[in-house]
Amino acid sequence: MSSYANHQALAGLTLGKSTDYRDTYDASLLQGVPRSLNRDPLGLKADNLPFHGTDIWTLYELSWLNAKGLPQVAVGHVELDYTSVNLIESKSFKLYLNSFNQTRFNNWDEVRQTLERDLSTCAQGKISVALYRLDELEGQPIGHFNGTCIDDQDITIDNYEFTTDYLENATCGEKVVEETLVSHLLKSNCLITHQPDWGSLQIQYRGRQIDREKLLRYLVSFRHHNEFHEQCVERIFNDLLRFCQPEKLSVYARYTRRGGLDINPWRSNSDFVPSTTRLVRQ
């Protein structure tokens, strides 16, 4: 269990509780979770973070009524800056989006502006929102993470409790390499409900070469770990930076969707540009 799982800041969340579904607009349904909850134990301070990045959300179940009452549908793309005070709790996000279902808006831009305003207020940070008509995305290919997949190793694993021990002495030699590693075996659990979260991970770095077996064992150790998606990515970034000390590092996870939403956080200390094309499990 995470050290802050019972923190009072989490007590009021609708996550893990029975809730009513509202279909008329209600911004109060949105709930934020302080990023400091997991950053403080990691020694990360808001005014001196070792990374930049965003939380990229895809909204697959977004609908409202136009001014004449005709339903509209869209796919939404949201990017929340890493400097925001709060991350956005996903169940509250789903409930908030449901509140658009029977609400009339004059035009698509009013919907976009409403989302941008409410999400920014909840997160207390910078946010951008784009809405796409379905025909704009039709034929979009399934993407893949560029890099070398480390999953097909012939190793025995019998411990699934989170530990950074595997990263001790996890670099090889003195030669500096630049490579991109990929794993599809990331599985963690929701901080509150302990429901499984499934993700694919891309790690891009420059530095002494990281032992791939040790890295895979470390990633598999998240299997019983309870934390939100964004928190896991920041933990992985921080642990790799601390133990492997690369000159450059980027960590990007794309998680499978739940409740019509997928969350795709990335953190980097270089000029990393993430691909936003959905992966095969998304």
Curated annotation (Swiss-Prot):
BP GO terms, sorted: queuosine biosynthetic process; tRNA modification
Any matching Pfam family: QueF
Result after altering residue 197 to N: Loss of catalytic activity
Binding annotation for substrate: 88-90, 229-230
Binding, NADPH: 90-91, 258-259
GO MF assignments: preQ1 synthase activity
Temperature dependence: Optimum temperature is 37 degrees Celsius. Displays a half life of 28.2 hours and 12.8 hours at 37 and 40 degrees Celsius, respectively, but at 50 degrees Celsius the half life time drops to 6 minutes.
Effect of residue 228 to W: 11-fold decrease in specific activity
Catalytic activity: 7-aminomethyl-7-carbaguanine + 2 NADP(+) = 7-cyano-7-deazaguanine + 2 NADPH + 3 H(+)
Catalytic activity, EC: 1.7.1.13
NADP keyword on record: yes
Recorded metabolic or biological pathway in which this protein acts: tRNA modification; tRNA-queuosine biosynthesis
Alphabetized UniProt keyword annotations: Cytoplasm, NADP, Oxidoreductase, Queuosine biosynthesis
Active site: 190, 197
Oligomeric and partner information: Homodimer.
HAMAP family referenced in this protein's UniProt entry, alphabetically: QueF_type2
Main function: Catalyzes the NADPH-dependent reduction of 7-cyano-7-deazaguanine (preQ0) to 7-aminomethyl-7-deazaguanine (preQ1), a late step in the queuosine pathway. Is highly specific for its natural substrate preQ0, since it cannot use various aliphatic, aromatic, benzylic and heterocyclic nitriles, such as acetonitrile, benzonitrile, benzylcyanide and 2-cyanopyrrole, although it can reduce the substrate analog 5-cyanopyrrolo[2,3-d]pyrimidin-4-one with lesser efficiency.
Family statement drawn from the similarity comment of this UniProt entry: Belongs to the GTP cyclohydrolase I family. QueF type 2 subfamily.
This protein's name: NADPH-dependent 7-cyano-7-deazaguanine reductase
The organism of origin for this protein: Escherichia coli (strain K12)
